[in-house]
């Protein structure tokens, strides 16, 4: 299913000058396909498409050739002798940002299409904290996690606290940007020296140290897939191969258990990223990031 946003509504997806760290703070933990567009801080005139996908935040550079267009571009024609700007992301070229966003509503970037812009309400919710305002804890014991929403850690790990929904269970982030619930009795409060904070907690999926808010962009950019369209179930059955094991909660009878290498018949594609399908004679829902779609033109090549 394609995204449910208006690509012509600039205010919903364009954030202007926003650092990579700020983008990660807004998108980390959001569902797959939530995104924003911002100005590149290292390449004036270019843009960056930041997207929550596959349990991390990916950043795709959008290069602009010629005069930079307004966002969204004005319908007025460029002056004589001035070539209209072209926007390039990976191997694809577009006349405008709305056209680019429309394309990735129905084509995969890496593991997701664009579903919806990140909510503006998160900007004022306190989600973006300067390093000196953040709260940290240090692990006293190893914790392997008991279910999918837990954050495993080792004794001595430094974690950043994001939220305290329960007295004995807090939401935290580790040095790789992974988030989850941690048991409070397993940790102690920790106050790092301000100069060493960036060495303790990473700010993006590449594992590089976070930069001050508004600082330069660390790490490389992701590259979108080449013309991977969202499949259409109306054209016939769609099959996928499991690439990540899934052990669902025992109390959720509608969830589908998956083993790496198994074949899944996809029966419904939901915009939330929770797909429905059949595997080993059972039906249920599963995260689409746990499977890889087979080549629908030559599916027999992947059935072995």
Curated annotation (Swiss-Prot):
UniProt xrefs under CDD domains: SH2_CRK_like, SH3_CRK_C, SH3_CRK_N
Cellular component terms per the entry's GO annotation: actin cytoskeleton; cytoplasm; membrane; neuromuscular junction; plasma membrane; protein-containing complex
Stored InterPro entries: CRK_SH3_C, CRK_SH3_N, SH2, SH2_dom_sf, SH3-like_dom_sf, SH3_domain, Tyrosine-phos_adapter
Cysteine-cysteine disulfides: none
Domain SH3 residue range list: 132-192, 235-296
Modified residues (Phosphotyrosine): 108, 221, 239
Post-translational modification: Phosphorylated on Tyr-221 upon cell adhesion. Results in the negative regulation of the association with SH2- and SH3-binding partners, possibly by the formation of an intramolecular interaction of phosphorylated Tyr-221 with the SH2 domain. This leads finally to the down-regulation of the Crk signaling pathway. Isoform Crk-II: Phosphorylated by KIT. Proline isomerization at Pro-237 by PPIA acts as a switch between two conformations: an autoinhibitory conformation in the cis form, where the tandem SH3 domains interact intramolecularly, and an activated conformation in the trans form.
Broad class of where this protein is predominantly found: cytoplasm
Keyword Transmembrane helix: no
GO MF: cytoskeletal protein binding; ephrin receptor binding; insulin-like growth factor receptor binding; phosphotyrosine residue binding; protein phosphorylated amino acid binding; protein tyrosine kinase binding; scaffold protein binding; SH2 domain binding
Domain of life: Eukaryota
Region Disordered, residue ranges: 60-85, 201-229
UniProt KW keywords: Acetylation, Cell membrane, Cytoplasm, Membrane, Phosphoprotein, Proto-oncogene, Repeat, SH2 domain, SH3 domain
Pfam entry (one): SH2
Subcellular localization, as worded in the UniProt entry: Cytoplasm; Cell membrane
Tissue and organ expression note: Ubiquitous.
Residues of the site described as Proline switch: 237
Entry-linked SUPFAM superfamilies: SH2 domain (SSF55550), SH3-domain (SSF50044)
Biased composition (Pro residues): 67-82
Keyword Disulfide bond assigned: no
GO biological process: actin cytoskeleton organization; cell chemotaxis; cell population proliferation; cellular response to endothelin; cellular response to insulin-like growth factor stimulus; cellular response to nerve growth factor stimulus; cellular response to nitric oxide; cellular response to transforming growth factor beta stimulus
Subunit structure: Component of a complex comprised of SH2D3C, BCAR1/CAS, and CRK. Within the complex, interacts with SH2D3C (via C-terminus), and BCAR1/CAS. Found in a complex with ABL1, ABL2, CRK and UNC119; leading to the inhibition of CRK phosphorylation by ABL kinases. Interacts with ABL1, C3G, DOCK3, DOCK5, MAP4K1, MAPK8 and SOS via its first SH3 domain. Interacts (via SH2 domain) with BCAR1, CBL, CBLB, PXN, IRS4 and GAB1 upon stimulus-induced tyrosine phosphorylation. Interacts (via SH2 domain) with several tyrosine-phosphorylated growth factor receptors such as EGFR and INSR.
Protein family per UniProt: Belongs to the CRK family.
Record's function text: Involved in cell branching and adhesion mediated by BCAR1-CRK-RAPGEF1 signaling and activation of RAP1.
Name used for this protein in its record: Adapter molecule crk
Organism: Mus musculus (Mouse)
